[in-house]
Amino acid sequence: MSNLLPFIGSFLFLASGIFYSSGGEKTNTSPFRYVPAGHHEKLWDSAKINPSQVFRIDKSISIYLENKQKYVNIEKMRVGGVPSAIVFTLHGRESTWHFGKHLHEGSRLTGRTRYVPKGRPKASPKNGHTYTFEESAEDALYKLKDMESVNWSRCNDALYNIEKYNWLGYLRYHRDVNSPYLWSGTQHYRKGKYVADGRFSSTAIDKQLGTCALLLRMQSRGIKVGFR
C-alpha cells in the first residue's frame, strides 16, 4: 500500500470526469459515458415540485431577489458565464446562501477550502486576510472548473453540469437514485444519498432543496434561469 501512496497523492480521479493534481488544479478532462441521451432534460420535463416544499422554496427565492446583483456580477465575470439563477442554486447547496463561505464546499472565507477541493483558491486573499464571496465564486466556477465553456442555454447541458459540479457518483454507481443535489424537493427524489465522501446510504434522506426544485419554481414565476 505504501508504494501506491505517491501515485494516489499525485492524482485523484473524481467521478465528474475531471482529473485533479494533489494541489487541486485541473489537469485535463475526459468524457463521461454513463449518461443516457437527454437524461436530464427528460427528468426536467416531467418534474413536479412537492406541494409541501413550495412555501420553503419561495422563501429561499426571496434570497435571490434580494441579492440578485451579487449573482449577476458572478455571471458577468466571464463571457458565457454561469447564469445568475444557477449560481444562486449552487450557493444554496454548498453553503446555504451564506456569503461568508466558499462556493466550492462551504468552508469559511477566512481561509482556503478545507474539504474537497481542498486548498482553494491558490492565490492569497486580495485584501490580505479574508476571501470575498466573489473571489471564491470566480475560483470555483471559472478557475478550478471552466464552467463558462458550458452551453447554458441547453437544458440538458445545464443540468448535467450542475450535477457534475457536485459529482456524478449517482449516475455512475447508483442509477436507481436521482441526485438530490438536483431533484430533492421534487417527485424525482425520495431517499438515498452520500452521507460522506464516497459513503452512500440507501435510507438517508437529503433535506436540502435541490437545484432543480428551485429553478422550476423560479421559471414558473417568470425568473430567467438561463435555459428555456
Could you say what each language-model-derived stretch is?
Residues S2-L12:
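Sec-dependent signal peptide recognition
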Residues L12, S16-N73:
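N-terminal export signals and maturation junctions of secreted/periplasmic proteins
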Residues F19-G38, G119-R228:
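Non-catalytic cell-wall polysaccharide-engagement segments
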Residues S52-I63, Q69-R78, Y115-Y131, S201-A204:
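Second-shell loop/turn segments in exported
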Residues L65, Q69-N73, F88, E135-E138, ...:
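Solvent-exposed, polar/charged alpha-helical surfaces in well-ordered, non-transmembrane soluble domains
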Residues G81-H98, A140:
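Short, functionally critical alpha-helical segments immediately adjacent to catalytic or ligand/cofactor-binding
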Residues R93-H98, R108-L109, M147-E148:
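Solvent-exposed loop/turn segments at secondary-structure junctions
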Residues G100-K118:
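Short, surface-exposed glycine/acidic/tryptophan-bearing loops
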